């Protein structure tokens, strides 16, 4: 079991501990539960889906990286496929506050980058901030997404974001988590190709500035993040954050990164290079390359 889970695991009910122990035994537990695993946990504990998600939140929050606030938030995004995806907030010392990742963004990106097609619900241990409510409104499930909070009845996003402004107001038809392929040819080595593939999945209807980041760890594992724009602009999630979300949730740490590649267009209206390289250097990665989409 990864050390970060030990304290939270010890506080779980005995029957949930017993059912989870073989799942968490792998140090690189992928921070997700398949539909089959969810069904097995429900049977072992007698909990329904909502109660089980609440019971698992401490494990999601244990994935938080909060050296600045020490305020750990956990989220579990429930995919329409039946898979549940953990998420947690992340802060980066030496970077800027704008680089921060919120738990809801983490869980949603985890699902999206794992190939999930849409979300049915998200469970969070604290009320989503306005930034996250706006981020969720970009999803293809948008205002119908169910939000579950401890001690409250579940409500749809539309109840938390009345009179919402979103992509439909800008006549955007393709939404976050819809399948997209921008068709750029995969060239270069495996890491460069992973970055280009991530850029091809970008959701960037506002700036038309595709980008993707791929991180290679010392053991050869590659984590890729795609750019995710938002109708309100500021809640946009950069591609580096997507890759760092996966790196963290899958049990790796920043010192494990040995090389990074950013893929973007040289003449794009928005450029990721400066922010990407500055944040990576703050995390200790100095081997950073850029490949140009053509």
UniProtKB/Swiss-Prot annotation:
What Pfam families does the record tag this protein with?
dCMP_cyt_deam_1 (PF00383), dCMP_cyt_deam_2 (PF08211)
Cofactor: how and how many bound: Binds 1 zinc ion.
According to the entry, every stretch annotated as the CMP/dCMP-type deaminase domain falls at 48-168, 186-294
The reaction(s) catalysed by this protein are: cytidine + H2O + H(+) = uridine + NH4(+); 2'-deoxycytidine + H2O + H(+) = 2'-deoxyuridine + NH4(+)
Q: Which UniProt keywords apply?
A: Hydrolase, Metal-binding, Zinc
**One Gene Ontology biological process:** cytidine deamination
Q: Which prosthetic group or cofactor does it need?
A: Zn(2+)
Q: Where is the active site?
A: 104 (proton donor)
Q: Which GO terms describe its cellular component?
A: cytosol
Its domain of life reads Bacteria
Residues bound to substrate = 89-91
Q: Which GO terms describe its molecular function?
A: cytidine deaminase activity; identical protein binding; zinc ion binding
Q: Which SUPFAM superfamilies match?
A: Cytidine deaminase-like
Q: Which EC number applies?
A: 3.5.4.5
Transmembrane intervals: none
Q: Which residues bind Zn(2+)?
A: 102, 129, 132
Give the record's family classification.
Answer: Belongs to the cytidine and deoxycytidylate deaminase family.
Question: What job does this protein perform?
Answer: This enzyme scavenges exogenous and endogenous cytidine and 2'-deoxycytidine for UMP synthesis.
In terms of NCBIfam families, this protein maps to: cyt_deam_dimer, PRK09027.1
Q: How does it assemble?
A: Homodimer.
- What is the official name of this protein in its record? Cytidine deaminase
- Give the gene name: cdd
């Amino acid at each position: 079991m990864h050390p970060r889970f030990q304290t939270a695991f010890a506080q779980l009910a005995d029957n949930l501990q017993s059912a989870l122990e073989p799942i968490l035994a792998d140090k690189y537990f992928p921070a997700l539960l398949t539909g089959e695993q969810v069904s097995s946990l429900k049977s072992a504990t007698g909990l329904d889906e909502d109660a089980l998600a609440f019971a698992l939140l401490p494990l999601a929050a244990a994935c938080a990286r909060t050296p600045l606030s020490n305020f750990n938030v956990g989220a579990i995004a429930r995919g329409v496929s039946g898979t549940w995806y953990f998420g947690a907030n992340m802060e980066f010392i030496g970077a800027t506050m704008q680089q921060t990742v919120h738990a809801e963004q983490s869980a949603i990106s985890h699902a999206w980058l794992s190939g999930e097609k849409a979300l049915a619900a998200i469970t969070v241990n604290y009320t989503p901030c306005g930034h996250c409510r706006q981020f969720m409104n970009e999803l293809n499930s948008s205002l119908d997404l169910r939000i579950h909070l401890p001690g409250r009845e579940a409500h749809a996003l539309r109840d938390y974001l009345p009179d919402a402004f979103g992509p439909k107001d800008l006549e955007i038809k393709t939404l976050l988590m819809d399948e997209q392929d921008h068709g750029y040819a995969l060239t270069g080595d495996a890491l460069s190709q992973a970055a280009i593939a991530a850029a091809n999945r970008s959701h960037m209807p506002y700036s038309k500035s595709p980008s993707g980041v791929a991180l290679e760890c010392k053991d050869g594992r590659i984590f890729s993040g795609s750019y995710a724009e938002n109708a309100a602009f500021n809640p946009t999630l950069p591609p580096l954050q997507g890759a760092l979300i996966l790196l963290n949730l899958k049990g790796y740490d920043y010192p494990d990164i040995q090389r990074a590649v950013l893929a973007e267009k040289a003449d794009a209206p928005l450029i990721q290079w400066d922010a990407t390289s500055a944040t990576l250097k703050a995390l200790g990665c100095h081997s950073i390359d850029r490949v140009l989409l053509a």
